[in-house]
Amino acid sequence: MNHRKEKIESAMNMLENNMEFLCVTGVEDKLQDDVMDTIESLKNAGIKIWMLTGDKVETATCIAISTGLKSKTQRLFFLRDINNVQQVTEELEKLKFQSDYILIIDGGCLDFCLKQSESLFFEVTMNANSVVCCRCSPTQKAKIIALIKKHTDKRCLAIGDGGNDVAMIQEAHVGVGIVGKEGKQASLAADFSINQFKDLKLLLLWFGRISYKNTAKISHFVIHRGLIISFLQFIFSIMFYCVPIALYNGNLIVG
């Protein structure tokens, strides 16, 4: 249908006249505890955060503000309702010279950018403080993770709590699933499972760092141990005229 949006607005203007509200209801999807504090800690640790959601642009923008993803000094740039190459290129070129901003893009425009201006799009998004992708399908979420891995050498962590996040979680280097009201699909598909979003702070900034340091220590120990054993075996062989006799038995070397 041509001019669908204009025709819908015309029909609404024709029908929605002389009407009285009988009641007004609202639905609020409350944030979990300490979400803002967790995001602030992750940002202070130098972690760039992307929000990939199926919500509409207005809802996603409100969530980005309420969670602290956008600071008071940062500007919002919107990419939406674009369907031609020239306009996409012009908007992305403008953003190349901007700084300290949040990019908000809808699913239709995102799909168009990835098809027509993939390299330019990721050049722009890497300069943004954060990126909010709205109206994303599960396939788009996984594709974004794959393209970030392709265009950068960064490690990607994906976190979600619903079945729509499974593909994204499996595509990332590290997947974290939240056990929530939407079921356990995400947590079962993930590398790590947590109960609330705030647990991500402890997982990354405490257990993640401790595990990294312990792994480094074990690696150093194995390397040094191997060098010492090899050197002692070399000296032992020279002392006994290169006779093929082992200085240590197999159990000691393995242990």
Regions found by a protein language model. Give the residues of each.
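Signature of the cytosolic headpiece of P-type E1-E2 ATPases
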Residues: 1-52, 58, 85-102, 112-116
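Conserved residues at the C-terminal ends of beta-strands
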Residues: 25, 53-54, 178, 196
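Short beta->alpha linker loops
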Residues: 55-56, 136
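Conserved Rossmann-like nucleotide-cofactor binding loop
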Residues: 57-58, 164
